[in-house]
Amino acid sequence: MVSIKSDREIELMRDAGKILAETHNAIADFIKPGISTYDIDKFAEKTVKKLGGECSFYHLYDFPGNFCISVNDEVIHGIPSKTKILREGDIIKIDGGVCYKGYQSDAARTHIVGKTSKEIEDLVARTKNSFFEALKVCVPGNHINDIGIAITNYINQFGYGIVEEYIGHGIGAKVHEDPEIPNYITKKKGPVLKKNMTLAIEPMINLGTLEVYTAEDEWTVKTCDGLPSSHYENTIVITDNEPQILSIV
């Protein structure tokens, strides 16, 4: 069941989103060649706590880290590791959640470590752009499937693979709530968008095939062709007019 949030609930989610956004900004400055994904995870945890929040992903479904940190062909759900060291040219996805006074925010960013090819730069930029294409249709009266249509129509012109096995979701007191939000076109329109619905929209775009698999650690999702993937996500709220992003500052 899709819940409609009160104004008070939305303000708490906005507070959670501010903490998460500031943490993402701090992580962007922290990333450099030679550090491990474990280093990033501990830095993220420390930053979230310093800002007054809690890391939502820690032990969520028994996930062992604070943030999901995925490198290169890893799409999502990468487990932070002391042995996974960043190198020049890596593409790293940071996906995290923050809980503040019982309410959640969820956002992901993709960073390039140092310099890389224009091909990878374009993938990262276009993944982010696809989120903002989706944001344009997040108005009352439209349907959930309009989000997938917007992402697909934008991404298909570049020939990338849109991950279908993992999707966006509603969010509120829980990280994952109804409705499910595919990043691709489905046969069903899905629920109607209404004022004060809160959604986590998160296109996951692969340079090559859309096909993915889960690694032996039972968490990390990787591309089947070994090519890089990019991920961009924000928590938003539907309003009477334009939607608002709750996870930026």
Predicted region positions:
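Active-site neighborhoods and metal-handling regions in enzymes and metal-associated proteins
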Residues: 1-249
